[in-house]
Amino acid sequence: MKYLCLAYGDEAGWNALNDNEKQELLANDRVIRDRGNLVTAVKPQVTAVRNWDKNLKVTEGTDEHHGLPLAGFSIIEAENVEEVIDLVANTPCARANGVIEIRPFWNLEN
């Protein structure tokens, strides 16, 4: 099954880590790729489009509407949600005062 993992966090949490902690967390990201679980991920560039009341607003960067900005997302293939939790629990956003939302995809092939 494939799972969408939304990563929320900000640079302050990341910058608060020492270099060894950062390297350890980035190594955990590499494990997900090396195991073949990572399906895809996005680049950090963001363009936000908002069209409230037919008033189009396009901005470079996140259009923050809550406490933490969306830092990125990935699509991970795993046997179950517990495996995904194990994979993402020690990634940068999960550890640097952020949060990762895990959402399973519908199986639309049947």
Indicate residue ranges for each PLM-predicted region.
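Conserved, structured core segments of small domains
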Residues: M1-N110
